[in-house]
Regions:
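PRPP-associated nucleotide enzymes
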Residues: 1-118
Length: 118
């Protein structure tokens, strides 16, 4: 199961969602987070949840630097610096952001790469 959220604070809601998914038969849970803040004791809560098998990986962006979470086996950081740079440049030049935000081509390539030949 793939979960996506815009922001992770303490992670309580996300952890409850993972727990519910596992209780209902989910085999592997992967979460993608745009702004992984990991506030308060969130990292230790996710350490415990990972040990309990509630999720496989958390994928977060480097929009928020979290040195401690980068050490975790369960965390994958995705570099979005280029996207930010392109966004700033286009805004400065009063150009459209639509093509930056349209992921249909990327998703199509990923799906076709995973499709076995007939």
């Amino acid at each position: 199961v793939f979960m996506a959220d815009d922001m992770l604070g303490t992670g309580g809601t996300l952890l409850k969602g993972m727990e519910t998914l596992k209780e209902n038969g989910a085999k592997k849970v992967i979460c993608s987070i745009s702004l992984p803040l990991f506030s308060g004791n969130a990292i230790s809560y996710f350490d415990e949840a990972y040990k309990a098998g509630l999720f496989y990986r958390i994928i977060g962006t480097n929009a928020v630097y979290q040195e401690e979470v980068l050490k975790r086996e369960w965390y994958v950081s995705v570099n979005i610096s280029r996207l930010f740079a392109q966004t700033i440049s286009r805004l400065h030049q009063q150009q459209s952001l639509s093509s930056l935000l349209d992921n249909r081509d990327i998703i199509g390539k990923l799906l076709s790469a995973d499709t076995p030949p007939s």
